[in-house]
Amino acid sequence: MIRAKKSLGQNFLIDKNIIDKIINTVSITDNEILEVGPGTGNLTKEILRNNPSKMYLVEKDSFLAESLKEIIDERVKIFNEDILKFDEKSLSKNKIIVFGNLPYNISTEILSTWITNLKNDYWFSDLVLMFQKEVADRIIAKFNT
């Protein structure tokens, strides 16, 4: 059994009902997908069953990045990198659907970076992200509260 590394803010997605809800939020078929922090690949497997044209996985944990090779096919490219240093815009000329069960310790920073860059370079079509409840509460809070 793989244990989540708290130092990397890992939290593995294992609930099939939640995975199904995530999958059903957007049309995956024939689209390019970026998954941030795929972890053990539970969401990855379901995305692949929905036939994306290409899929990019960014996983900082080298052990997990290596283990993901067992569940992928020719449509998938794995990047063993830190998403905060990763150049998402270099992946494709097409708009990409982003999925992420974001690492809790950097989720706010990732979202802030992507939203800040929206006005300059709109590289994704959809963001389907999971956050820790406390992070989600901060995101939807009124300004200056």
Label the model's feature ranges.
Residues 1-145:
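Catalytic cores of RNA-modifying enzymes
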